[in-house]
């Protein structure tokens, strides 16, 4: 029997609604707007890192669970919940700050230790929330808590059954975190040598770590009552409203529809140049994009600029990638990019800025990863129309869009099949053989590069999000091209969504499902016109 699980997708937003009702969000943005204009918002350089106090976390959790059982005064119970959330947010803030500082210098032993300590708390935090919500589900004040002004109708239904977060499962989560940190410690050195040298020295070790993760994750899925790890991850981590089987069918359609186009373009070599690009060029590109888009995008950029909530400088000791993270206690997002110093950096910064805008607009509320990636990739596409005019960059982005379908599709296919490999094949040789087969089927070459994909280690079954969200983002671009202002309006309004499920979000936004019959043929026709 499948154990009941529920991943909290909008914790910060729920916290805001729980304490103050919907009106608080509007008041928050009004206050934030005045802070921006007055230049009074917290700067990143003034943010203080405090190592999480686990004893306080546990004590407040115990007190909150006891209050859920015994308290008859709604306001007193809400105050107790608030006290717990305060500690919870402090830990989330420490996690975000430690990740940012460690990413800025991955040779810094202090920040490495702090990041590893904080990241290892994920399982404990989620288990704590699960325990709290199960206690509230039994509270005599549950009817009031499930009112519209607080958690909402039937919120606690998901917490009435058996909890997954027992000692055994939490131990698995801790083991997973240890393996992830083992990977990141080695991955931190990738920028210190040529990629070929790095792979020669470390590929087999990293492959072994991935194999251990696959074995462990299959055990986790079985323990939770699922037939496969992809099914488990789709629900537990990503809250998807489509299945791994739908993904498999979609990837087969990409192979049939877009891989031949990809191969044709690779042979003809379109006239696209990857120009060099300075940090100033990258910053100016996104600044002009925000000015052109206006509204929420411009407000978010002001916040990012005035509070120093970004790092786009190059560095050999920095994390070799990019991300955006929300800093809960300060109620602001942060963007990190380690640039390649090519024109592609403009798109990368625009991508992470799209995530920044969503977190700014939604008060840090979390949606499903597929929905979140629509905002980032949508901002990339819209930058082509609202940023500085650049025909070469437009072609580069469209080629990149095709590559997302094909190359990220190949990675998604490899990852999904990886969790079906026989245990005797879960080694460097067996995984390489699978990777080569998958790459060949997508018209690509493949060696050991899969060990350089952090998502396989830290965010399992995430990669398909890039593919399906790319399709939605491309639709927003097409909408804007057809009628000026419509795509921009769609993207800005979507930033405020509380709809976490991808297909439901698409319907809400008036967009097609990427799985819709004929959709890939439309994409192929559009890309052919631009790239051939």
Each PLM stretch: what is its role?
Residues 27-281:
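A well-structured
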Residues 159, 357, 412, 420, ...:
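C-terminal, non-catalytic "cap/extension" segments appended to globular domains
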Residues 348, 352, 356, 360, ...:
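Catalytic glutamate of the conserved HExxH
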Residues 13, 17-19:
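Hydrophobic core
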Residues 256-257, 362, 367-405, 469:
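Post-HExxH zinc-binding segment in Zn-dependent metallohydrolases
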Residues 310-332:
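Catalytic zinc-binding patch centered on the HExxH motif and its immediate surroundings
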Residues 330-349:
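Short pre-active-site segment immediately N-terminal to the catalytic Zn-binding motif
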């Amino acid at each position: 029997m499948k154990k009941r699980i529920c991943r909290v997708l909008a914790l910060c937003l729920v916290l805001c609604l729980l304490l103050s009702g919907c009106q608080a969000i509007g008041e928050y943005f009004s206050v934030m707007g005045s802070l921006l204009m007055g230049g009074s918002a917290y700067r990143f350089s003034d943010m203080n890192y405090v190592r999480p106090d686990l004893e306080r976390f546990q004590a407040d959790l115990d007190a909150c669970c006891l209050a859920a059982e015994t308290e008859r005064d709604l306001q007193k119970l809400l105050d107790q919940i608030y006290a717990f959330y305060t500690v919870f947010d402090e830990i989330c803030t420490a996690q975000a700050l430690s990740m940012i500082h460690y990413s800025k210098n991955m040779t810094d032993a202090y920040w490495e230790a702090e990041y590893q300590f904080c990241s290892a708390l994920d399982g404990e935090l989620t288990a704590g929330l699960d325990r709290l919500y199960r206690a509230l589900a039994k509270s005599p004040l549950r009817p009031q808590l499930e009112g519209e002004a607080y958690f909402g109708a039937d919120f606690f239904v998901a917490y009435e059954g058996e909890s997954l977060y027992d000692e055994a499962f939490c131990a698995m989560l801790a083991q997973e975190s240890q393996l992830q940190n083992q990977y990141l410690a080695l991955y931190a050195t990738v920028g210190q040598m040529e990629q070929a040298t790095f792979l020669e020295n470390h590929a087999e070790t990293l492959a072994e770590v991935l194999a251990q993760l696959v074995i462990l994750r299959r055990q986790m899925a079985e323990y939770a009552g699922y037939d496969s790890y992809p099914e488990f991850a789709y629900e537990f981590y990503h809250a998807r409203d489509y299945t791994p089987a739908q993904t498999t069918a979609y990837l087969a359609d990409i192979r049939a529809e877009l891989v031949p186009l990809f191969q044709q373009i690779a042979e003809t070599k379109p006239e696209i140049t990857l120009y060099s690009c300075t940090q100033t060029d990258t910053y100016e590109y996104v600044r002009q994009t925000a000015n052109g888009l206006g509204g929420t995008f411009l407000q978010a950029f002001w916040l990012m600029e005035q509070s120093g909530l970004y790092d786009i400088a190059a560095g050999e000791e920095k994390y070799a990638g990019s991300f955006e993270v929300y800093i809960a206690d300060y109620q602001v997002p942060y963007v990190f990019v380690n640039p390649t110093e090519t024109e592609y950096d403009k798109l990368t910064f625009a991508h992470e800025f799209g995530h920044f805008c969503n977190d700014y607009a939604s008060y840090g509320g979390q949606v499903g990863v597929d929905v979140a990636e629509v905002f980032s990739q949508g901002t990339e596409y819209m930058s082509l129309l609202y940023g500085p005019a650049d025909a070469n960059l437009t072609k580069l982005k469209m080629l990149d869009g095709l590559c997302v379908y094909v190359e990220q599709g190949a990675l998604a296919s490899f990852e999904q099949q990886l969790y079906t490999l026989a245990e005797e094949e879960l080694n460097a040789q067996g995984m390489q053989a699978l990777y080569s087969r998958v790459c060949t089927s997508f018209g690509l070459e493949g060696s050991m590069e899969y060990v350089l994909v952090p998502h396989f280690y830290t965010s399992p079954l995430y990669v398909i999000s890039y593919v399906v969200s790319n399709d939605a983002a491309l639709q927003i671009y097409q909408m804007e091209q057809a009628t000026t202002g419509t795509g921009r309006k769609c993207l800005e309004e979507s930033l405020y969504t509380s709809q976490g499920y991808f297909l439901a979000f698409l319907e809400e936004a008036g967009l097609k499902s990427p799985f819709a019959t004929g959709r890939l043929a439309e994409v192929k026709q559009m890309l052919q016109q631009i790239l051939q």
